[in-house]
Amino acid sequence: MATTKPYRVLLYYMYTTIENPEEFAAEHLAFCNSLELKGRILVAKEGINGTCSGTVEQTEKYMEAMNNDPRFDGIVFKIDEADGHAFKKMHVRPRPELVTLRLEDDINPHEITGKYLEPKDFYEAMKQEDTVIIDARNDYEFDLGHFKGAIKPDIESFRELPDWIRENKEVLEGKKILTYCTGGIRCEKFSGWLVREGYEDVSQLHGGIVTYGKDPEVQGELWDGQCYVFDERIAVPVNQKEHVIVGKDHFTGEPCERYVNCSNPECNKKILCSEENEAKYLRACSHECRVSPRNRYVIQHELTEEQVAAALEKIEAGK
């Protein structure tokens, strides 16, 4: 018999009207703290976007309170079991937008958005000809895992996506467009923007990758790698039938699914690397970052100037 883990991680969003995001954020933070939840929740006039962790009892109380608030009627929680908290602290922050597109004329998903496809329909659509699959996430998310045949827009943040589409419109013209993201919130706006731009056949994965991976029928099939998540777990599995590693070590190109942040705080780039290469390259993505006086790996491990010089010499020699 399957054992239930003592903690849960909740992932959810809802486009709805919140009149005073600042006031709501302060009250919601106090409520979350009273339940001893930990997580990161963004609040805007257009709605709420959150992920938080707690015990089964704590998360049940939270979901009950949210469901009893008329503003969040119909909200859907994606639930993962966990052995402990997925966050260190609890943050609830007001924001101008739930997802940052910074369009002059913003998209309201209640007014315009792409067609919703449930996992089975999305699975079937991916196999059709004349279909283009666009990953609406950032480059480092794609590098860890993605749907087979998906296009990787060369972007570092979501707000760069519209410009990338305009520069590569020949890839999409006359095609059926499928979009997907982690939980669905980015695609609500992105697919709506595509429709407004004049693309006629635009669909989005309802509930995102997380829902697709839990679907009992598709079982995450056609997904390679893992799904990047914005908590201490970093990655979660999607494909229940086979696990194909697509991530590549930043330094050697070998298969890798272990993310670290570059040790130079002014860079902080997410890089895939093994524990061995983390030590060898001082957890820095480049020579410039390795020699940074603020290199966190050097400080954390209390390395002397001689030890750093020896490490740099070894890298230079290709050893």
UniProtKB/Swiss-Prot annotation:
It catalyses: uridine(34) in tRNA + AH2 + O2 = 5-hydroxyuridine(34) in tRNA + A + H2O. GO terms for biological process: tRNA modification. Keywords: Oxidoreductase, tRNA processing. GO terms for molecular function: oxidoreductase activity, acting on paired donors, with incorporation or reduction of molecular oxygen. SUPFAM superfamilies: Rhodanese/Cell cycle control phosphatase (SSF52821). InterPro entries: Rhodanese-like_dom, Rhodanese-like_dom_sf, Rhodanese_C, TrhO, TRHO_N. The active site is at 181 (cysteine persulfide intermediate). Disulfide bonds: none annotated. Residues 127-221 form the Rhodanese domain. Its EC number is 1.14.-.-. SMART domains: RHOD (SM00450). Pfam families: Rhodanese (PF00581), Rhodanese_C (PF12368), UPF0176_N (PF17773). PROSITE patterns: RHODANESE_3 (PS50206). NCBIfam families: PRK00142.1-3. Catalyzes oxygen-dependent 5-hydroxyuridine (ho5U) modification at position 34 in tRNAs. Belongs to the TrhO family. This is tRNA uridine(34) hydroxylase.
